[in-house]
Amino acid sequence: IPEFKEKRIKNMLLITSGFAEIGAEGRRLEEALVQAARDADILILGPNTMGICNPHDTLFCCGSNVRPKPGTTTIVSQSGNLGVQLLDFAEHEGIGIRAFGGSGNEAMITIEDYMEAFEVDDLTQTVVLYLESVKNGRRFFQSAKRVGKKKPVIMLKGGRTQAGNRAAASHTGALASNIRIFEAAARQAGIIVVAQPMDLL
């Protein structure tokens, strides 16, 4: 990371896993990573992410060969595998994609940051979310309410079973909230809540 600072690099996409999602040792490593990035004035997307894509700019930095056409639907997924499945479905069905982000562990850039970006992005006309947890519930729901007044926000919440909760923790390094409470709050914020992945698109 200090070498990146010398090259004046401001952003880093970190696909690598082995950080907060694996436990205490990984959390310490992630905290050290974040501190090094802050010292170098660098923003990290990830770690433990499948990457990003922006078909409008032919930017495909993700662990998949899918190439959906440009469009107006933006996808952010805390599960990289599900995110890639959604991209594959979009490509197969001819659904245009504005952008995709696999948010990973959200060590620096969080789902709340994404939501605030969607609010001012005119190319995004529909927001699709797969969430396992949020770090700042108040900020998330406030931004979702603002975005929802301008464009639909569609969400699938992971962790519907005990096994799902464990899987969510392994993906994001955070515990999933009680799903009924979370979904009720989401509906109050104007989010369209669905129960199956393919209902997102």
In which residue ranges do the predicted regions lie?
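Catalytic-core regions of core metabolic enzymes
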Residues: 1-201
